[in-house]
Amino acid sequence: MSRSSAGFADFFPTAPSVLQQKRFKVTRERPRPKAQIDSEHSDESSACPTETRAILNLSNGGASLDSGQISSTDLKKTSPESSVEGSASSTAGDRSALSLSVAQHGANSHEARLDTLTPLTNAESSPPQKANSPRNKIAEGIVANTTIDTKSGINPLHTPPTPQSQGRRTGSIRGYKLVYDPDTEKRSSSKEKRRKPRYVDIILSEQNNCPPDPRLGIPNYMRGAGCKQKRKYRPAPYTLKPWPYDASSTIGPGPPAQIVITGFDPLTPIAPISALFSSFGDIGEINNRTDPITGRFLGICSVKYKDSASFRGGGPVLAASAARRAYYECRKEQRIGTRRIRVDLDRDGVVSERFVARTIESQRMGQKSNLQSTEEVKSDSETKKNEPPPTAPKGPSGKTSVRPIVAIPEGPRANFLKPVMPSLVEEVPILGQIKRDPYIFIAHCYVPVLSTTVPHLKKRLKLFNWKDIRCDKTGYYIIFENSRRGEEETERCYKMCHMKPLFTYIMNMESQPYGNPSYERSPSPERCRAEQRERAERERLKREVGLDIEEEKRQRAVDLDPCQEVLTIIIRDLKDKLLEDVKSRIAAPALYDYLDPDRHALKRKTLGIADPEGIKRPMFRIDDSFGTPDSRSGLSDARRPFSGSTPNILALPRIRKARHLGRTDTAFLDERRKQPLRRREVRPLYHRLQQLHDVDDSDDEQRTPKDTDEQDSRPPSRMSSGTSESDDGDGFVSEALGLPVVELAGSGQNKEPDEILKDNQSVGESSQLESNEISPELRKRKRASEELEARKRQKEDDELFGINPIAEAEVEGTQIIATPIAVDINLEVSEAALSILPKESNDNRQETGEANHLDFDGIDVTSSTIEKDRRGILDPLDDIDNAAAREESRTEVGWRVSNDEPRPIVDDDDAIIMDLDGWQNLIKDDEDLHFLRDILVGYSESNVGNLSAWAWRQKEIKALNHPGDVGPLRGGTGIAGYYVPNTTGAARTEGRKRILESEKSKYLPHRIKVQKAREEREARAKNDPHTAAVEAARVAAAKNISKSTSRSTRVNNRRLIADINAQKQALPTQSGDGDVLRFNQLKKRKKPVRFARSAIHNWGLYAEENISANDMIIEYVGEKVRQQVADMRERQYLKSGIGSSYLFRIDENTVIDATKRGGIARFINHSCTPNCTAKIIKVDGSKRIVIYALRDIERDEELTYDYKFEREWDSDDRIPCLCGSTGCKGFLN
């Protein structure tokens, strides 16, 4: 039993030869026609014995089957069913049919036998029997008629080879071909259309057994000729006829009118050149170019033509036509002299300038090369002169000595000796000369300092890119390039050579990759000059501002009206005094009167609250500060003209305990009778409830003055026991009732109205009390005589000191005229007027009434005036319990019939906007309101909540939209040009169109409102000189404010960097340590800023502290991209609707994009007069964009800088500038 060996195709199925064989088999294995199937039925009988023999051989385990014993054709002829299936199947189907028949035969003969088709196939992978197979039926019949002795066991069967595909027989019908179709005939009659189509059989022959590919019949099909397009291939665009230049309609520069000639001899005169090129047109200018340094000709000539009306008796010739003709005729074969020239068109002179620059550069290079060659020739000649003659004897080496022995010269020849090689050890310390260059230092204690050591050290460190090696007495300095590469090279040299030997020494190195750590950068001369200029400018501006302020002060002093200033000061003081007087004289007594327990007796009785003890008499009273001092205070003040005569308005009213409350028979006491000393008055704490003075008042102003006057210093009219009844009762009546007040004749005192009233009351009261004890007439005469004597003494004193009696009273809105009167004053007070007084005992009420009748008999006070005052002062206090406000009286308008012509009562204005104010203005009376209600009957009510709150909210919204406008309006809420109507009626039907930047600028109501407010403020400042002076003073004060300098900060940053570098050297060197310990100086120097809404555009950046000029503010950070990527992103931003792109160019190839990744520096707006500038600096070898201050910037000032967009002259949509500064250019581009 043998096994077939695997072939080349099994191991290399993808080999080209194997693939070609497979393609060949596929072309051969094509389905056969039905005609061949009918011819094969006759061969069935002959095919059966063959198949029987094949199966017997397989069952006997004989030799393996090959293609010669059992062919695929014989197997296919066993039965009609198998033949039909085989004609439509592939080679694999034939092979499977054969194997199934054999396997079925083996399984029927020997049940315990396993047949294998392949060496790796058994019964588990493929079942031995298969139902309903025609091959099984044939195999069973054959096996039943034969008796074959086979041995039991597993006999592996050889896999039959792949049979070749069955080819079709020659002469068989392959198909049908339509040769006549009446439907497709164009010129056919109705009879011909009735004919039937004719078909012709396609017979298979030897030539067309494998029909050729019809596509190969197309010429050059493999080269693409089969899919030719109808379009014509055009390797170059059409050559169109150029349009003639028209200066009136063409935009841009015209055709060139100038040519440049090169290639001629530089020594050629200008005459032949001019003669040659003047034949083409009139020459306007000819220029033979020369070297600007040496003045020699370069062989380059520029010829510029001009338009001529008639050239050499002919027609007009344009300058462009003459230049074009000269270019086309002289560019190839034209010669000047013996050289061929070259002519080029030169529109703007750029070509000639390029030729001149190139020629000058080549001449410079040629001169340098010639100079070097001459120097080499001279050196060679000098060496040859010093060589010995050829016949001189040679040395032992057989070569001439390169360095001949020269005798030491004597005398004058000693001057021609070469100087001695200078020592490499420098006397000046090198460390002070190194600024920022990285270096490595080797101290002299490790390697001795010698000049001969420097070349050896250079050779030792030749693997590193050092810039220079220098030495002084302290040691050696290996200096590297001042860049990031130099720093890395310094670190690499330190790592590889530190503590390594140099001859017999050890190189103990000290690395400084960031230069001299103790170096402090001094300002450059340019910066010093710039600072000096700025300082001089600031001083000049300061002097000018000072001069302007002084001039303004002098002008104001000239224009100042003293009367007006005095009037202003008086009005201001009157207002302050009136406020304090109202607090002390009206508010405080009214509050105390309201808090009187007698007023609330009915309420306590209703609520069942017991009466407090001691309510019969008030335990405290308010003693007026203007009534307690003696009446001669005016005299004492007049005698001291430089002392303050104004009484302390801000002092609190003095509250003291009333004495002798039980006495009702108080009489006028004798002036010789001394009163007992007063006890220390106790001041209750509830006086703090009265805010009668400011918080900033001093303690002396708030302290109540004590009554320490002696009795002798008082006038007789004031020497009384001073009971609380007279002070509280009568004084309050005079104040509350608002009675007219006059001053007695010859008083010579500055008194308030209540003081005069109290003096008169005290006089009458004392006389009345004294008359109860002594005879009334005697008491009156005695009292009158004493009073007259006192007044005479006071008048004499006033005349002695030259003081005129003046009485003033300052009350807001009321002018009180003090007139000296020498008549008796009578007052008739009705019972209704007295009923408003506080409730007191009968005795006190009687005394008060008598005093009033005695002192005021001549003045009639009607009950209406008293009632009005009572309503204005006391009624609000009574209405607190009832919580109801009285409605003020409204002015009524009386309407009458017009006399001349009929006129409407009210002219309705249709332009008024019908908002809340508009409706209130429209409705004039109750009739209008009634009609409005009738109109709104059919409408449902709106739920607006609280009506008052809703009305207040509507008016607040109106105030926000129309600041400063009150009442009805005649213009709608909107911005001019904000709402643009659509031509089609709706925005959705407009389509896509570009919105101009000028129109976008109108969509900034916030900016427009701020701009309007700014313009109004500036206009008011211009009209008001006081505001201008205040603003100038504020600017001057802001300049004097000390601003923090960043010099100390930079010094601290340098020290911190040095410490970090020292720590980096001490740490183990690993990848990434440098990035972890990298120090960003820009973050440490950043100023505190914030972003907020800007009046210029959208968001803005504001300073949070004062920033000095030339200080760094912030770094502009973002994503670093190339220029091509930035252009692509800008287009994407425009398409996606991002209105603002934050692209900042660093150089020609790099752009910072902060649109989606960046800091708050991108919010800085543009201004034509900015306060900042952007600079590009290098930090650690990389370029950064940093914003610096151009001038001193105050806190909360917006930061701006100039965007510096390129000017777009031919742009239809320029970006408008919204900065609003005085130097605004109007557009960004």
UniProtKB/Swiss-Prot annotation:
A motif (RxxxRR motif) lies at residues 1050-1055. Residues 26-44, 375-387, 523-541, 691-715, 784-796 have a biased composition (Basic and acidic residues). Keywords: Chromatin regulator, Chromosome, Methyltransferase, Nucleus, S-adenosyl-L-methionine, Transferase. Residues 57-73, 118-135, 144-153, 362-374, 759-774 have a biased composition (Polar residues). S-adenosyl-L-methionine binds at Y1203. GO terms for biological process: methylation. Residues 22-198, 362-403, 514-541, 620-656, 679-733, 746-796 are annotated as: Disordered. The keyword Transport does not apply. SMART domains: N-SET, PostSET, SET. Residues 1213-1229 form the Post-SET domain. Residues 1087-1204 form the SET domain. Residues 80-93 have a biased composition (Low complexity). It catalyses: L-lysyl(4)-[histone H3] + 3 S-adenosyl-L-methionine = N(6),N(6),N(6)-trimethyl-L-lysyl(4)-[histone H3] + 3 S-adenosyl-L-homocysteine + 3 H(+); N(6)-methyl-L-lysyl(4)-[histone H3] + S-adenosyl-L-methionine = N(6),N(6)-dimethyl-L-lysyl(4)-[histone H3] + S-adenosyl-L-homocysteine + H(+); N(6),N(6)-dimethyl-L-lysyl(4)-[histone H3] + S-adenosyl-L-methionine = N(6),N(6),N(6)-trimethyl-L-lysyl(4)-[histone H3] + S-adenosyl-L-homocysteine + H(+). Its EC number is 2.1.1.354. It is an enzyme of class 2 (transferase). Belongs to the class V-like SAM-binding methyltransferase superfamily. The RxxxRR motif forms an adapter helix that bridges the nucleosome and ubiquitin. Catalytic component of the COMPASS (Set1C) complex that specifically mono-, di- and trimethylates histone H3 to form H3K4me1/2/3. Binds RNAs which might negatively affect its histone methyltransferase activity. COMPASS recognizes ubiquitinated H2B on one face of the nucleosome which stimulates the methylation of H3 on the opposing face. Component of the Set1C/COMPASS complex. PANTHER family: HISTONE-LYSINE N-METHYLTRANSFERASE SETD1. This is Histone-lysine N-methyltransferase, H3 lysine-4 specific. The lineage of its organism: Eukaryota, Fungi, Dikarya, Ascomycota, Pezizomycotina.
